[in-house]
Amino acid sequence: MQRRIGIIMNGVTGRMGLNQHLVRSILEIRKNGGVNLPDGSVLMPDPILLGRNEEKLRAISNQYGGLRWGVDIAECLANPDDTVYFDSGTTALREKNVLQAIKAGKHIYCEKPVSTMTEAAMRMAVAADKAGVRHGVVQDKLFLPGIRKLQRLVKAGFFGRILSVRGEFGYWVFEGDLGQSGQRPSWNYRKEDGGGIILDMFAHWRYLLDHTFGTVESVCCTAATHIPYRVDESGTIYDCTADDAAYGMFQLRGDIFAQFNSSWTTRVYRDELFCMQVDGTEGSAVAGLRECRTQHRVNTPRPVWNPDVSNSICFRDGWIDVPDNAEFKNAFKVQWEMFLRAIATGEPFPHDIWDGVRGVQLAELAIKSWHERRWIDVPALDTE
C-alpha cells in the first residue's frame, strides 16, 4: 500500500535546496519508489515548491516534470494535505516562516543554522514541542561516507583513548572579479543578512563533535574578515561585514581536545575540501567527505628530527584505506528518509531542532570568545 505525504519545500531555488534536497533527495526517493515502512507500506513524498521568484519556480517545475509550486506561504500552509514544511531559505527569515508553519500544524524539517540567535532557535524548538509536531534539522555531515567509516572506527574502539581531533575545512571563494564569479551567494559575507562562516560552519562542527566524539564543553575562537570587499550577483562591489575565516578550539567531554580551521579564503592542498584527523593512543585516522584512512600504533613509523638531511620516510604510504563494506547513499537523502519514516511510525528522530539550537549556541559563544579574546564554557540547554 502506498501512502502520500505532502511536503512544502521553501528555498529550492537556492543551490543546496535544489540540488541536494529536491533533486538528489525527494525526487530520487520518488524515483526509487518511496520510503519503505516497517508495516510493508510505502511513503511517497509529494513536493510543492515555495519561493519568492515565480520565474525560477516555474522553470524548476517544468524541468522536473511539472511539480506543484507557489509563492504564497500562507496559501501553501493552508492546504491540509501537505503536512510537512521544509525550509532551506535565508537564515534570517527562518524563524518567522517556521513558527508560521508550526502554527499551521505542520511537521518541521529545516536547514542549519536554524537561526542567527540561540534565543530565536529555542523559540522554534519550544513551539514545535508544544504543538506536538515532529521536527528535525539537517545534519548531513554525519551521513557522509568518510564520516560513517570514522564512526565505525570509534564504535570499534580502534583509537584506544581518543586524544585530539583536528579539522581543516575550506577553499578559495572567488571575489567576483577577474571574470570568476563567487561560488557562494553574496549574503554569506554580510553580517546584517545572517552571513559569516562561524554561524554557518560551527553549527556543523557542533553536531559532528557531539555525535561522534563527545559533547562540546568549552570553546575558544578567533576570526577575521580577510577579504574586505567582493562583487555581488549583479556585478556591484560591496563591503564584506561578516567573518570569512574562523579558527576554533574546543574542549570535549572525556578530555578530548579539538581544533577546526574554517575558511573561504584558503587554497586547497589536501585530498578533500574537508579533512579531519583523529589521534588516539592505539591509532589515528584521517577522514574526508568520502574517504577514511588509518594508521595503527604498530604501523607507526619512527621519525627523528634532522633538518640537515632529506626525509627518507614517505609518511602517506603508512596509511591504510578503510573499505566501504556497504553502499553509501546521498547523505541528505539518507536523513530525509529517516525523518519521513519517523513521522510515519513515531520512532525517535535524534536530529531535532534542539540539536540545531546547540549549533547556534556554539556559534554565538564562539563569536563572544572572539570578541572577548577568551575561553567560554558551553552550558547544557534547558529543553523543558
Where in the sequence are the language-model features?
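C-terminal glycine/acidic-rich active-site capping loop/insertion
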Residues: 231-234, 238-239, 247, 251-254, ...
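Glycine-rich, aromatic-lined ligand/substrate-binding cores of catalytic
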Residues: 200, 208-219, 223-231, 236-284, ...
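Short acidic low-complexity segments
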Residues: 68-80
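Beta-strand-loop-alpha-helix segment that lines the small-molecule cofactor/substrate pocket
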Residues: 83-84, 90, 95-142, 157
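N-terminal Rossmann-like dinucleotide-binding module
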Residues: 1-64
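Predominantly a Rossmann-like dinucleotide-binding segment in NAD(P)-dependent oxidoreductases
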Residues: 141-240, 373
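C-terminal capping/lid region of NAD(P)-dependent oxidoreductase domains
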Residues: 160-164, 368-384
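Glycine-rich, N-terminal phosphate-binding loop of Rossmann-like dinucleotide-binding domains
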Residues: 88-89, 370
